[in-house]
């Protein structure tokens, strides 16, 4: 699942009235979310620019409440149309230098604070109106048994390839829904190797766990983690003849273990293991933003799929099941309040019935106070 990034700076089209922009984006968003499916492309846009656009297109609603009419009393209160889209604050130029991705995102981005996810049709409309860039596409992937269990893979797997016995290294990005065969192909392309002479190992924690020989299995099913190592083994000797292949390496691997030790030393000398990888508190950074129709271009907080950067949280290979939460702080009080509310019969009954009829959709104060409220104002409640 290749993900291409484009440093496209489009020329903006003639201006469209703010009210028309708001209506078009609302309608396009509702239609796009209703038909979202696996493989659809979504685009990141910086929250800073998005908020300026929101303020611009809803100012007529806000002013109609503040002034009692749609006319502004003071021309200085009129918000100007935003300039070109500028996503550069999302880009990590340093990380891009060592990855196969043309553009790398900062590791610590948070949806709703740093960026917003837009359906392709919405991005294309805004990009056509305002121009700018760079373009940051991401794919919707399936995360469950149902076809509707979709997520946006904002951060594809970042893997470090270690070539044995030469000791070369490379950093790549690949979707966790790609197959082992696709990883094998990409590794051969990176190191310019002959596929029939190469096998790859799950090298999590600098330990050879298993030979990755099931080419149809997805990396997710193979339990491959964010920022882990993949050992790429060339199965020919110095004379170019086969040395017994991967099966032989499993039985007689002393030479490979010595080479692996040297690879560890080489990696520690390079910047790959420390500076260019999120190796402190963010070692496992596999965000998947949940896509639901009950929210406007928002997803739940990206989950840290694998926090093996924290010694107490090594869960690789653990069976699925119930889990606890760590370091919740004061959120326990919020949880207690929610539990009380949802178990109050009158309160619960109210939200099971058609409470939508009591919502005043025309009240701009209630609908545009916060970022979430302004976003919700652009579409009917689903």
From Swiss-Prot:
InterPro entries: DUSP-like_sf, Papain-like_cys_pep_sf, Pept_C19_DUSP, Peptidase_C19_UCH, Ub_carboxyl-term_hydrolase, USP_CS, USP_dom
Superkingdom of the organism of origin: Eukaryota
Main location: membrane
Every USP domain range: 323-382
A matching Pfam family: DUSP
GO cellular component term of the entry, any: plasma membrane
Key words of the record: Cell membrane, Membrane
Coiled-coil parts of chain: none
Tissue specificity: Widely expressed with the highest expression in floral organs.
Methyltransferase as UniProt keyword: no
Domain DUSP: 16-141
Compartments (UniProt record): Cell membrane
GO MF annotations, alphabetized: cysteine-type deubiquitinase activity
Disruption phenotype: Abnormal floral organ and pollen development, and leaf bleaching.
GO BP terms, alphabetized: protein deubiquitination
Role: Plays an important role in the development of floral organs and chloroplasts. Does not possess deubiquitinating enzyme activity in vitro.
PANTHER family in UniProt: UBIQUITIN CARBOXYL-TERMINAL HYDROLASE, UBIQUITIN CARBOXYL-TERMINAL HYDROLASE 5
Similarity comment: Belongs to the peptidase C19 family.
Protein name: Inactive ubiquitin-specific protease 5
Gene name of the record: UBP5
